[in-house]
Amino acid sequence: MELEKTTEKLQKILIKALNICKDYHNPEICDEHMFKAYLDDDDIRKILSELKCDVNELINVTNNSLNSLPSNDSTNDPSISRYLYESYNEALKLSREKGDKYLGALDLFAVELFNDSSFTKLLRKHIKFNKKDLMDKINRVVSKSSLY
């Protein structure tokens, strides 16, 4: 991942996810860490609420999943999970197709929520919208601001 190709907002979320991963002593940064960081973000919480999503339920699912991840005592920096890496690349491609100079947090969030990891499949059982609904909402929000 190249942080210089991401917005400040996404950089903060990625750093927060890394710190969560380290706090839990997990060997790789994965969707659970990212979603813990995403769900702390007011803008993402607002979008989910507007889509009639129970954010607290998603937080509970995320926390439960985080607690079940393998941990180790290694002091090495964690690696990036395959699903996060693939989601990042797909979101970067999407942002370029839209003509964006930087990858924003909302685009990565949307792509990652609909990837094939077992965690995001579990999360999707707790939402009532599809990827198109989420992308439409994000595009309306992003058109008003370049901070995402």
Please report, for each region that a protein language model flagged, where it lies by residue.
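Histone-fold recognition with a strong bias for associated Lys/Arg-rich disordered tails
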Residues: 1-148
